[in-house]
């Protein structure tokens, strides 16, 4: 079950920006035999998203291209650049044993997405995966964009986590 939770204080995105126009986090319990590698989990989540998310992204791209903002199609072309690692369309800003931080900087806003794995509570109940997003807007365009996109963003995150659970999380390496 996907639950909205507080932004984890141990996450690198908690201090990514001096101010945030959006900060949210959603958590799901992982099965005890699943991978806890945040890179593996991030790649998996983005590879099995529901098809309607791709359609929604295409609509978004058609609208924002007219404002000179980065499109998913453009970001996908950057995936082959070995000097700037990416997961799906997102630039990798940092990795650790428990977390991968993704995001993008654009003229209207900057954002960071964290995939963080932490021990479950109570112990021996599997690990928790928390997907957090923090957004810092630069201007009116960013704030307007965020006000329109925020409700969709929350649905996309929840649906992505649910879909990953339905498909079945990648197993831990033996």
What is each PLM-predicted segment?
Residues 29, 103, 130-132:
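Beta-strand residues in well-ordered beta-sheet regions across diverse protein folds
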Residues 79-123:
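Hydrophobic-ligand binding "helix-grip"
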Residues 107-147:
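Beta-strand/loop substructures that line and gate deep hydrophobic ligand-binding cavities in soluble
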């Amino acid at each position: 079950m996907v639950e909205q939770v507080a932004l984890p204080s141990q996450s690198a995105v908690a201090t990514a920006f001096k101010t945030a126009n959006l900060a949210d986090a959603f958590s799901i319990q992982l099965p005890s035999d699943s991978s806890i590698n945040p890179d593996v989990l991030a790649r998996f989540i983005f590879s099995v998203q529901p098809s309607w998310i791709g359609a929604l992204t295409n609509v978004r791209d058609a609208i924002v291209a007219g404002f000179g903002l980065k499109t998913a199609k453009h970001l996908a072309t950057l995936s082959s650049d070995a000097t700037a690692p990416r997961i799906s369309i997102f630039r990798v800003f940092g990795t650790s044993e428990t977390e991968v931080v993704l995001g993008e900087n654009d003229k209207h806003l900057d954002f960071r997405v964290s995939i963080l794995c932490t021990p479950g509570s109570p112990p021996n109940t599997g690990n928790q995966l928390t997907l957090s997003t923090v957004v810092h807007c630069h201007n009116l365009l960013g704030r307007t964009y965020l006000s329109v996109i925020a409700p969709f963003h929350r649905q996309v995150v929840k649906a992505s986590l649910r879909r990953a659970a339905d498909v079945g999380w990648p197993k831990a390496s033996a």
